[in-house]
């Protein structure tokens, strides 16, 4: 037998043969049911056909499950080794004695469940196989197998892909239908551009024509590149437009101010220096009041000996007085230091060297009010037990800067004989 025969064809051939009743037999020819009387023998014969010596019923049953999905063979539930042809195939060349009644089986199978027959062609029967004339001269066993194999391959039962591939083939006449519709639309659109291409109908030809017409003005505009520049220059020179004028007004404004400033004899640097001068003038304006308060405090403290005994911290305020000496002594330095040199100029604010007036001078750059400080500073200075390291420095710490301070350098070391001052005084190294 031909090895290309499928399993269901092999079983059907066994059922057609009269001498195979002991291994396979019909249980219901009308329903297409058959039973594997000797399932192992049927499997062995199927193995011989496929050249597989190790074939058994387990492998045969798994092969039959493949036809479950193809809707060719179905297992009858509740009965062992009983199967049923769902779509009973017609084998060409079989005689009426060997073949079961085909019309009855085909009708019952078509009524029961035969979705493959729905996809069959006009020449197909309920089996889904193309109809072939019986007795076409193919009496040979190999010829029957080949024809059945080829017919099965061409039928829709072999694979669903063949059905899907055969369906688009009869559809070529369908594309001419849109083609016939297109000529109807194109003639309607052809006269429209001829009469007036500006019509509102959204035809592709009109859109293309409009795009071409729209491209022509672009070429005309690009040919004279100097025209836009002239127009822009005219727009900039034209006084009717207000956009270019504001920059001119903004530019002319500062120029007029600079010219007016130059005409008046003031430069931009002088204008910038005015706030600084005003700030320095404000400081100088307040300095007399601060200095008068300082001198008044010095006069009040000159009677006590503690004012003279506090020059120990004199060296620390010198660093603080260096940046302040040029600004604080800008106009009053010569009055306070009439005959002193550079060293006396740095030590000119004598009251700042005492702890009583040190906080006031450190606060003057911050422009804080020193009016509330003198009472507390006065008590702190009278109660401070700090004594100078050497009394010889007293004459250099307080140069004569006013009539109120004339008595300060005249005080000698004997004036330090108060018990409050002499307790820590000369004993320090």
From Swiss-Prot:
UniProt-annotated stretches for the region Sufficient for interaction with MAD2L2: 350-400
Protein family membership: Belongs to the ETS family.
Subcellular location per the Swiss-Prot or TrEMBL entry: Nucleus
PTM comment text: Sumoylation represses transcriptional activator activity as it results in recruitment of HDAC2 to target gene promoters which leads to decreased histone acetylation and reduced transactivator activity. It also regulates nuclear retention. On mitogenic stimulation, phosphorylated on C-terminal serine and threonine residues by MAPK1 but also MAPK8 and/or MAPK9. Phosphorylation leads to loss of sumoylation and restores transcriptional activator activity. Phosphorylated and activated by CaMK4, MAPK11, MAPK12 and MAPK14. Upon bFGF stimulus, phosphorylated by PAK1. Phosphorylated by PRP4K at Thr-418; phosphorylation activation ELK1 transcriptional activity.
PTM annotation (Phosphoserine): residues: 325, 384, 390, 423
Positions annotated with a glycan in the UniProt record: 382
Gene3D superfamilies from the UniProt entry: Winged helix-like DNA-binding domain superfamily/Winged helix DNA-binding domain (1.10.10.10)
Lineage of producing organism: Eukaryota, Metazoa, Chordata, Craniata, Vertebrata
Tissue specificity remark: Predominantly expressed in the brain, and to a lesser extent in the heart, liver and muscle.
Subunit structure comment from the entry: Interacts in its sumoylated form with PIAS2/PIASX which enhances its transcriptional activator activity. Interacts with MAD2L2; the interaction is direct and promotes phosphorylation by the kinases MAPK8 and/or MAPK9. Interacts with POU1F1.
Protein name listed in UniProt: ETS domain-containing protein Elk-1
PTM-bearing positions, type Phosphothreonine: 337, 354, 364, 369, 418
Spans annotated as Disordered: 119-146, 165-204, 227-253, 302-354
CC per GO annotation: axon terminus; dendrite; mitochondrial membrane; neuronal cell body; nucleoplasm
Molecular function (Gene Ontology), one example: RNA polymerase II cis-regulatory region sequence-specific DNA binding
Keyword Transport (UniProt): no
Pro residues biased stretches: 169-178
Biased amino acid composition, Polar residues: 302-312
DNA-binding region(s) in UniProt: 5-86
GO-annotated biological processes: cellular response to gamma radiation; cellular response to testosterone stimulus; gene expression; hippocampal neuron apoptotic process; liver development; lung development; positive regulation of DNA-templated transcription; positive regulation of transcription by RNA polymerase II
Organism superkingdom: Eukaryota
Function: Transcription factor that binds to purine-rich DNA sequences. Forms a ternary complex with SRF and the ETS and SRF motifs of the serum response element (SRE) on the promoter region of immediate early genes such as FOS and IER2. Induces target gene transcription upon JNK and MAPK-signaling pathways stimulation.
């Amino acid at each position: 037998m031909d090895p290309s025969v499928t399993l269901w064809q092999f079983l059907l051939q066994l059922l057609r043969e009269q001498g195979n009743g002991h291994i396979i037999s019909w249980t219901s020819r009308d329903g297409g049911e058959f039973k594997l009387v000797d399932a192992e023998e049927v499997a062995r014969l199927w193995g011989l056909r496929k050249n597989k010596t190790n074939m058994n019923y387990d492998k045969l049953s798994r092969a039959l499950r493949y036809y479950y999905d193809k809707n060719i063979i179905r297992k009858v539930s509740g009965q062992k080794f009983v199967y049923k042809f769902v779509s009973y195939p017609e084998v060409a060349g079989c005689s009426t004695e060997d073949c079961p009644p085909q019309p009855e089986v085909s009708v019952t199978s078509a009524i029961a469940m035969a979705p493959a027959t729905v996809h069959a062609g006009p020449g197909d029967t309920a089996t889904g196989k193309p109809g072939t004339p019986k007795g076409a001269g193919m009496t040979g066993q190999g010829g029957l197998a080949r024809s059945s194999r080829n017919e099965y391959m061409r039928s829709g039962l072999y694979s669903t892909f063949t059905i899907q591939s055969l369906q688009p083939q009869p559809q070529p006449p369908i594309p001419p239908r849109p083609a016939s519709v297109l000529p109807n639309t194109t003639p309607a659109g052809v006269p429209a551009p001829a009469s007036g291409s500006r019509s509102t109908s959204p035809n592709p030809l009109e859109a293309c024509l409009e795009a071409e017409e729209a491209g022509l003005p672009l070429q005309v505009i690009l040919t004279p590149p100097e025209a836009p520049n002239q127009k822009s220059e005219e727009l900039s020179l034209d006084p009717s437009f207000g956009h270019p004028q504001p920059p001119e007004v903004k530019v002319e404004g500062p120029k007029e101010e600079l010219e007016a400033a130059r005409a008046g004899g003031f430069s931009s640097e002088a204008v910038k220096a005015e706030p600084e001068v005003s700030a320095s003038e404000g400081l100088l304006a307040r300095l007399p009041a601060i200095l008068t308060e300082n001198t008044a405090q010095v006069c009040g403290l000159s009677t006590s000996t503690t004012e003279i005994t506090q020059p120990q911290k004199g060296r620390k305020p010198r660093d603080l007085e260096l940046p302040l000496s040029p600004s604080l002594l800008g106009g009053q330095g010569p009055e306070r230091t009439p005959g002193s040199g550079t060293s006396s100029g740095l030590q000119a604010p004598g009251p700042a060297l005492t702890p009583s007036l040190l906080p006031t001078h450190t606060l003057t750059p911050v422009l804080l009010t020193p009016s509330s400080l003198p009472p507390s500073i006065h008590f702190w200075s009278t109660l401070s037990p700090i004594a100078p390291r050497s009394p010889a420095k007293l004459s250099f710490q307080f140069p004569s800067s006013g009539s109120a301070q004339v008595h300060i350098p005249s005080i000698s070391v004997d004036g330090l004989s108060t018990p409050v001052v002499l307790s820590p005084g000369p004993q320090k190294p």
